[in-house]
C-alpha cells in the first residue's frame, strides 16, 4: 500500500511537471497524401508542444508551390508518407514560449521552406541557414532532429509550432492573403536578383512566367531594369506587359528568338520543366550571368555541356536556393513596403479542391499562385 501511494504521488508530480512545461503535444488537423497519387485526404496528427523558444502559429493561408507537387509525386526521388505539404505559410501567433521576445500573441507570422539548422556552421554563421553543413530542417518531408526526430509536416494544416528564430515577422499592414507565396517564391527570386546587384537600365530576362517568374518581374521592374519575359505560351503576354516587362518572347516562335544573342546582363531561369539552358547562356553579354532557381523533375533535368560554359565569353551560371532567414525577412519587408505581391487565386481547404489545384499546376493552368484559405478547414 505504501509503495502504491508513493508511485501515485510520483506520477502526479510528473504529470504536473509535464503540464507546466507544455508537454503533451499540439493536436493538428490538415490534408495529407498517403502515396504518390496526389490525392489529398483529411489527416489528424500531433505536433510537439511549444517550447521555451518557440511559437505556435494559427495558419491562415498556405501557398501551393510547384515543388510541393514534385515532392508529392516523388518527381525528385522516394518520399515518406503520409505527407502534409506546404512551405509557404502565413498566420497569426496564438502561443509563445517563455523566452520568446520576437513575437507576441496576435502578431502575424510566417514560415518558409525551413524550420531549423545547426546555427553554428560556417553557412549558418553567415545567415545562410539553407546551406547548413549539418542539413537545414525542411518545413515538411523531413525529420526534426531537435524535437525527438519528429517528422515535419507542412502548412496544409491548422497550426505550426516553430522556433521564433525561424519564423518571419509579417508587417501588420501586409495583405495577409497574399503573403504566403513570398516566403518561397518571393525569396527564391529576390535573393539572386539582390546578390547580382541589378541596377537601373540593366537588360535582364526572366525565363518562365509563373509563380516565381511574375514576382521576379516585379522586383526587377522596381529596380529599374529593362525586363524581357520568356515563356512558352501567348496567354501571359498581356500580364507581362501589365507588370512592367518591356518585351515578351514566346520561345516556341522561332521568329521571336532572332537577334537575342549577347543582349542580356542577367537572366533568371525559373523554369520547372525540361528546356535548353544553353539557349539562354548564348543570350548573355560578356560577363553576363544566368541564375537557375527552377528545378524540373529528375527525368526532365536539363544538362549544360561544358563547352557552353568555357567557350562563351566569360558568362557565368549559378544556382540559388531560397534564402536565409535574415534575407527572407528583408525580402518580406521590402515587398510589403513596395506593394510587391503575388497574384493569387484563393481556394478552400478541402481535399478535392487541393487535388484539382495540383493537377492545374502541372497543366500550367494557374495565374499565378494558388493559396489555400486554411480558415475554411472543417
Task: Report residues per predicted region.
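Bacterial Sec-dependent N-terminal signal peptides
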Residues: 1-22
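Short N-terminal strand-loop motif that marks the start
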Residues: 21-90, 154, 158-162, 166, ...
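C-terminal hydrophobic helical "lid"/dimerization subdomain
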Residues: 22-26, 325-378
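Glycine-rich beta-strand-centered segment in the early N-terminal region that forms part
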Residues: 48-62, 75-125, 130, 153, ...
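Mid-domain Rossmann-like dinucleotide-binding core that forms the NAD(H)/NADP(H) cofactor-binding site
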Residues: 109, 171-253
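NAD(P)H dinucleotide-binding glycine-rich loop of Rossmann-like/cofactor-binding domains
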Residues: 118-207
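Glycine-rich cofactor phosphate-binding loops and adjacent beta1-alpha1 units
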Residues: 196-200, 228, 232-316, 377-378
Amino acid at each position: 500500500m505504501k509503495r502504491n501511494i508513493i508511485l501515485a504521488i510520483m506520477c502526479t508530480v510528473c504529470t504536473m511537471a509535464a503540464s507546466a512545461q507544455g508537454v503533451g503535444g499540439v493536436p493538428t488537423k490538415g490534408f495529407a497524401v498517403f502515396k504518390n497519387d496526389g490525392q489529398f485526404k483529411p489527416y489528424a496528427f500531433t505536433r510537439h508542444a511549444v517550447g521555451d523558444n518557440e511559437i505556435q502559429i494559427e495558419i491562415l493561408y498556405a501557398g501551393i508551390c510547384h515543388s510541393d507537387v514534385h515532392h508529392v509525386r516523388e518527381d525528385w526521388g522516394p518520399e515518406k508518407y503520409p505527407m502534409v505539404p506546404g512551405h509557404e505559410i502565413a498566420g497569426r501567433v496564438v502561443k509563445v514560449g517563455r523566452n520568446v521576445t520576437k513575437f507576441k500573441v496576435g502578431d502575424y507570422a510566417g514560415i518558409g521552406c525551413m524550420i531549423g539548422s545547426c546555427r553554428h556552421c560556417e553557412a549558418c554563421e553567415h545567415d545562410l541557414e539553407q546551406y547548413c553543413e549539418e542539413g537545414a530542417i525542411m518545413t515538411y518531408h523531413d525529420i526534426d532532429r531537435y524535437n525527438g526526430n519528429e517528422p515535419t509536416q507542412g502548412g496544409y494544416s491548422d497550426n505550426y509550432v516553430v522556433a521564433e528564430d525561424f519564423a518571419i515577422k509579417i508587417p501588420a499592414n501586409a495583405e495577409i492573403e497574399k503573403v504566403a507565396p513570398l516566403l518561397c517564391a518571393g525569396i527564391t527570386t529576390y535573393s539572386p536578383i539582390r546578390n547580382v546587384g541589378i541596377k537601373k537600365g540593366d537588360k535582364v530576362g526572366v525565363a518562365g512566367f509563373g509563380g516565381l517568374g511574375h514576382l521576379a518581374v516585379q522586383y526587377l521592374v522596381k529596380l529599374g531594369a529593362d525586363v524581357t519575359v520568356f515563356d512558352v505560351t501567348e496567354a501571359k503576354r498581356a500580364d507581362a506587359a501589365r507588370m512592367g516587362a518591356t518585351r515578351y518572347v514566346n520561345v516556341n516562335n522561332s521568329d521571336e528568338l532572332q537577334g537575342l544573342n549577347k543582349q542580356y546582363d542577367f537572366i533568371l531561369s525559373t523554369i520547372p520543366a525540361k528546356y535548353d539552358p544553353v539557349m539562354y547562356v548564348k543570350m548573355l553579354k560578356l560577363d553576363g550571368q544566368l541564375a537557375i532557381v527552377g528545378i524540373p523533375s529528375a527525368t526532365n533535368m536539363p544538362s549544360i555541356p561544358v563547352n557552353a560554359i568555357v567557350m562563351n565569353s566569360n558568362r557565368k551560371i549559378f544556382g540559388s536556393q531560397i534564402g536565409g532567414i535574415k534575407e527572407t525577412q528583408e525580402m518580406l519587408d521590402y515587398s510589403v513596403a513596395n506593394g510587391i505581391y503575388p497574384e493569387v487565386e484563393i481556394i478552400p481547404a478541402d481535399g478535392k479542391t487541393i487535388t484539382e489545384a495540383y493537377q492545374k499546376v502541372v497543366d500550367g493552368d494557374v495565374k499565378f499562385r494558388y493559396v489555400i484559405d486554411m480558415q475554411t478547414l472543417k
